[in-house]
Amino acid sequence: PERDGDYLVDGVINLREGAQVTVVAVMTDADRTRWLVGAPDQDRYLLCEPVRGHGLSGEPPRHILHADQDYALERRGQSSAAGVGMHGRPALPRVATYVYRAGPDQTLWLERWGDQVLMGAATSVSAHDVHFLPGS
């Protein structure tokens, strides 16, 4: 996904898996939507571009072919979910998350809300490259 932009946060989902909290910020810059995924104590974020029309529903497979790349499941988890704002996710209390990799900087982030699957093609960005304005 394109990294540069002045994004406005439309909504936020806090995902809690045990003691680990992951934040998904749904952001827009003009007509571009991106998801910024990460934990406050990590030094890297995933910057995801939503993938439409992927055809997945229910439990995702162990391998996903996307943009001529074979992505293998690296990690999955179950989290409680609490959202605010216009995040575009179903109003469900739990979500399953999946991380797939095809290379060092070729990542897919998936969220499964019941049978609905959301997919983002992601690149890793340094937390030092992400800046939040005061009051955000």
Where are the regions that the model predicts?
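Mixed-charge, low-complexity intrinsically disordered regions
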Residues: 1-136
